């Protein structure tokens, strides 16, 4: 059995991204791991995200996340309140899903409900 350890994100501004993660997760803490600024963020629920500086704009496979997804009630209001770029929305059996970009141009989506979907509730 494998156990989840952490996800990694490569961004232009590490400290600004830590502050963004604290907004999106409504809290959290972080530790600097290296002199280059590499840091580890820990969400209130214990999700670890390692944040590194992008080495090259020519390497998109080493940049950003691939559409992180969170569940949050009042998702659209949260996106608007934090001046995030709303891209579009979709319907699911449980409710609305909102797609947005953060300040680094990384696309996220927020499910506007708390119950897990059939895709990850097993």
Give the residues covered by each predicted segment.
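Short, Lys/Arg-enriched, disordered terminal segments
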Residues: 1-2, 122
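Loop/turn position at the start of each blade in beta-propeller repeats
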Residues: 2, 36, 93-95
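Vicinal oxygen chelate
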Residues: 3-12, 31, 41-42, 57-122, ...
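Short N-terminal helix-initiation segments at or just after the protein's N-terminus
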Residues: 7-17, 46-50, 83-87
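Intrinsically disordered, low-complexity acidic/polar segments
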Residues: 18, 50, 60, 77-79, ...
């Amino acid at each position: 059995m494998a156990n989840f350890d952490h996800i990694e994100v490569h961004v232009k501004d590490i400290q600004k991204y830590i502050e963004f993660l604290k907004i999106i997760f409504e809290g959290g803490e972080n530790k600097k791991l290296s002199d280059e600024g590499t840091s580890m963020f820990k969400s209130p629920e214990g999700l670890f995200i390692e944040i590194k500086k992008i080495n090259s704009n020519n390497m998109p496979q080493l940049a950003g996340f691939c559409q992180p997804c969170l569940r949050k009630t009042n998702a659209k209001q949260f996106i608007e309140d934090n001046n995030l770029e709303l891209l579009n929305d979709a319907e699911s059996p449980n409710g609305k899903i909102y797609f947005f970009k953060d300040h680094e141009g990384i696309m996220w989506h927020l499910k506007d409900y708390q119950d897990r979907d059939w895709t990850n509730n097993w």
